[in-house]
Design a protein with these regions (language model features):
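Acidic, Mg2+-coordinating active-site environments of NTP-dependent enzymes
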Residues: 71-75, 196-350, 428, 432-434, ...
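Short internal beta-strands
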Residues: 63-69, 239-243, 379-380, 404-410
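ATP-dependent carboxylate-amine ligase
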Residues: 1-15, 36-39, 313-323, 327-337, ...
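N-terminal leader/targeting and accessory segments in enzymes
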Residues: 1-91, 95, 246, 268, ...
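Active-site regions of enzymes building and remodeling cell-envelope glycoconjugates
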Residues: 75-83, 148-151, 256-261
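Well-ordered beta-strand positions
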Residues: 39, 64, 196, 238, ...
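Short secondary-structure boundary segments
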Residues: 67-70, 179, 201, 243, ...
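Phosphate-binding loop of NTP-binding sites
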Residues: 89-241, 249-255, 309, 371-372
Length: 494
């Protein structure tokens, strides 16, 4: 709870009409979430203008409104006018919640792929040390052991600050957070002071939003510039960077904080080598500070070796010993929808994975090739209203690695699913090897059933793109759809 006058002080050149001595009990930009004592922030969005809902907010109990254009208010509530309500929101909302990030250790993980698994590994290690940990990411929000649903990888400013405040109230000491390029570019994490920044990798994605790869890289680098800023509230900053990635050196240049680089090529300060993998596990040696440690994991894939190194680096910066990290990792289990094995007693492997980028798809296919002697059967599609340039690239990758490829729908959203499939098919035809078979089955359920029905002993069926998601977004509705459920149902029919 704060007085409006305290919030107004954070704004640039506000024009105030009304009483600023009122108490503010909540802040929101969603008129549907307004309650008595709220400050309503009117945002002019791409499809909806919050200024049209000012009076609805007042009727619901708002005692003040923040606007950027003239409005007729049917009440004597305080009206604060600024040039840009979105920019104002980024400064006043963290202030309202008393900058909760300053009361926790904040670990931000950014990169195209690997964010979710890395954040969960970090959480697992921290929890093993007795810390109460919060997680914000693609799969869910976690406060201690309680899970809550999430709609964006990184929530908007209001939701994020509310979540962080709740974490502090519930005694969370460490928050591990996936930080998306959208959030960094749009300022959603303004007011969050990170202690450790982790870079996993950078490959093609989100070019529909960022337009160029340089813009995409620049957005990611904002996190590392932030941990380098002088005169921050908290001390003990650090960065963990994948130096094997083509852009790792560029990220290194963006921070002056202490850095741990990681590698499997031997070029990092933290290195993995002698990697041995099975379909369900991996074992390798990690070298750090002149010592070697044998790491045994219940996860597989070279990409997970990288994820583990990122998590190790972050926890080393948190002061946890390599011995304690190693001990905790032995009990880590795979994250839902991340190379998740579906087992119903069948004589072949079925894996569900979230891979929805060219690099992500190639990673899981390379893993399948390394651990499976027989055929690789791929079921995948590409999302609508997203970066269309990656569709033929992913099609080509699927055809280059897969022995049988089923091109299907993902989340078509407002686009025609048939056209999306055609875009993917261009790449599939380009990458076809001799003996490779591909088929278009637009209905995702049918594609999964077909792939499983035609699998032979020793094959591996990779169902890629949706992972943990339990929905499918169509043009006019969102339906329940879970690749794992569909795979199990199909397996029970064979």
């Amino acid at each position: 709870m704060k007085h409006l006058q305290d919030i107004v002080k954070t704004l640039h050149a506000p024009h105030v009409e009304g009483n600023t001595a009122v108490e503010i009990l909540d802040v929101t930009a969603d008129s549907r979430a307004v309650k008595a004592g709220s400050l309503f922030i009117a945002l002019d969005g791409a499809t909806v203008d919050g200024h049209d809902y000012v009076n609805k907010a007042v009727e619901a109990g708002a005692v003040a409104v923040l606007v950027s254009k003239p409005v007729e208010v049917n009440s004597d509530v305080c009206v604060i006018t600024v040039e840009d309500t979105r920019a104002a929101m980024m400064s006043c909302v963290p202030n309202f919640f008393d900058y909760p990030a300053n009361s926790m250790r904040m670990i931000g993980v950014t990169g195209t792929n690997g964010k979710t698994t890395t954040t969960h590994m970090i959480r697992h290690i921290l929890k093993a040390q007795g810390h109460k940990v919060g997680v914000i990411g693609t799969v869910h929000i976690m406060i201690g052991d309680t899970s809550y649903p999430i709609h964006n990888t990184t929530p908007d400013v209001v939701d994020l600050q509310h979540i962080l405040h709740q974490m502090v109230e519930e005694g969370v000491t460490h928050c591990v957070m996936e930080v998306s390029s959208h959030a960094l570019a749009l300022g959603r994490v303004t007011g969050v002071e990170y202690d450790t920044a982790v870079f996993t990798n950078l490959t093609q994605d989100h070019l529909d939003f960022h337009k160029t790869f340089e813009n995409y890289l620049a957005a990611k680098c904002k996190l590392f510039e932030q941990v380098s800023k002088p005169n921050q509230v908290k001390s003990g900053k650090g960065a963990v960077i994948n130096i094997d990635d083509a852009y790792g050196h560029r990220v290194v240049e963006k921070t002056t904080a202490p850095i741990i680089t990681y590698s499997i090529d031997g070029s990092g300060t933290l290195n993995a080598h002698d990697v041995d993998m099975t379909p369900k596990s991996s074992r390798y040696t990690v070298s750090y500070d002149g010592h070697d440690y044998t790491v045994a994991m219940n996860t597989t894939g070279l990409f997970n070796v990288y994820n583990t190194l990122a998590a190790i680096g972050a926890c080393l910066l948190e002061g946890i010993s390599m011995e304690d990290i190693d001990k905790a990792l032995k009990t880590f289990s795979a994250v839902p929808g991340r190379f998740e094995l579906i087992e119903e007693g069948q004589p072949f492997a079925v894996v569900v994975d979230y891979a929805h980028t060219p690099d992500g798809l190639e990673n899981i296919l390379q893993t399948a090739k390394a651990i499976q002697a027989n055929r690789i059967i791929v079921v995948f599609g590409c999302g609508g209203d997203r970066d269309a340039t990656k569709r033929p690239i992913m099609g080509r990758i699927a055809a280059q690695y897969g022995d049988v490829v089923y091109v299907t729908s993902d989340n078509p959203r407002t686009e025609d699913p048939v056209q999306i499939v055609k875009d993917v098919e261009v790449g599939v035809k380009d990458g076809l090897r001799e003996g490779t078979h591909y088929e278009v089955i637009v209905d995702r359920r049918e594609a999964i059933q077909h792939a499983i029905q035609h699998a032979k002993p020793g094959d591996i069926v990779l169902i890629a793109g949706k992972g943990h998601e339990d929905y499918q977004i169509l043009k006019d509705k969102t339906i329940h759809f879970d690749d794992r459920e569909e795979a199990r149902a199909a397996l029970k029919e064979i």
